[in-house]
Amino acid sequence: MSLQIDAVILAGGMARRMGGNDKGLVELQAQPMIKHAIDRIKPQVREILINANRNQTRYAEFGYQVISDEDSGYLGPLAGMITAMGQTQAKYLLVVPCDCPLLPADLVERMLSQLEKENADLAVASDGKREQPVVLLLKPELRDSMKAFLDAGERKIDFWYAKHNCAVADFSDQPNAFVNVNTPEQKQQLSEAIAK
């Protein structure tokens, strides 16, 4: 457990591709997807925040602080991140989505190592083929930069990354760690793969 790192699990989206069902609460292997994410990151961080814009009471049942976007317009992952950045007192904030049930057990360790090695402002995970834009470790002091970005009407997360010294943490040895579930079909495929 790191005393300098808190985490936010992003569960604030509209889940259009999941038929509007709240992805964090969709069951995979008999438990809500967010529970898989919690179990994976809990040993790696000090505190966990859950960013949710609906079903807040249900999310609170997991025993962690639930925060809703400061702006209620469903502005995407940056809105959840900026809200969490304003809530944490930690040196770093880990950001993960609620629909990645196979996150690495060494996620924080490797991301922090890469961030410090490059003296970067943030580190984003890569599965070896592509970067995972909502799996990152960042300094909460970047909040003002993110606020200015959002206030300018910007929403593309990678455009915001480009404004900062961004390290890339390589997880090509764990290519399935960032498999996420956006559709009922993907949920079924992942459930079958886990059961094997």
From Swiss-Prot:
GTP binds at L10, A11, G12, K23, N51, D69, D99. Coiled coil: none annotated. Keywords: Cytoplasm, GTP-binding, Magnesium, Metal-binding, Molybdenum cofactor biosynthesis, Nucleotide-binding, Transferase. Its main location: cytoplasm. GO terms for cellular component: cytoplasm. It is an enzyme of class 2 (transferase). The keyword Electron transport does not apply. Its EC number is 2.7.7.77. Mg(2+) binds at D99. One of its GO terms (biological process) is bis(molybdopterin guanine dinucleotide)molybdenum biosynthetic process. The keyword Magnesium applies. It comes from the Bacteria. One of its GO terms (molecular function) is GTP binding. Gene3D superfamilies: Spore Coat Polysaccharide Biosynthesis Protein SpsA, Chain A. InterPro entries: MobA-like_NTP_Trfase (IPR025877), Molybde_CF_guanTrfase (IPR013482), Nucleotide-diphossugar_trans (IPR029044). The N-terminal domain determines nucleotide recognition and specific binding, while the C-terminal domain determines the specific binding to the target protein. Transfers a GMP moiety from GTP to Mo-molybdopterin (Mo-MPT) cofactor (Moco or molybdenum cofactor) to form Mo-molybdopterin guanine dinucleotide (Mo-MGD) cofactor. Monomer. Belongs to the MobA family. HAMAP family: MobA. This is Molybdenum cofactor guanylyltransferase. It comes from Shewanella sediminis (strain HAW-EB3). The gene is mobA.
